[in-house]
């Protein structure tokens, strides 16, 4: 009986080559099945973080312009939202928000140039285009950065504001689009939403998203300490 027990122990001791190969194959199959899920999860986390950074950039820019810590964009859109032809009622409000939101997306030259001084973070700020940089990684604003954010900003101006610059600063619409800085690394046009298609990047996606599309788009009303109710009424066709 003692001899038989020893033989049984020796017979079951260790793994055979076939068992080891089967274990390797099973582990390989499991890794192959799990790898896409891991990659998708990491991609979604990265994209969600980018959308969060872009939202913060948009909020900080709007707050900075509203408090006048950031210079207002010089890219202006003429909006005459008063129907001066209709007489019932006179000066009826004529919304032109679609015209405002149809401002063209930036066209990249493939080499984004921004100042390195913190006092003037605008890459460009003129009557045709206003681009403001948020240097997220601290290495200077560059189209090679995967973390920096570029804000395209534009504001409305009324016909009266063209005649009197001080009136234009009393209240206006501010449009903001936030793009990834690496969207400007290629000499192609960026994209934007229109009245039929929303093009902003989703927080959850099967990849890293369309880097040419805006991360965030928003429109808000800007008023200052000089803004009065009369200014808003004049711009919108009067108050009842």
Segments from the language model and where they lie:
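N-terminal leader/signal peptides at the extreme start of proteins
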Residues: 1-15
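Flexible, low-complexity segments enriched in proline/glycine/serine and punctuated by aromatic residues
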Residues: 34, 49-55, 59-240
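Aliphatic-rich helix starts adjacent to a transmembrane/signal segment
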Residues: 15-61
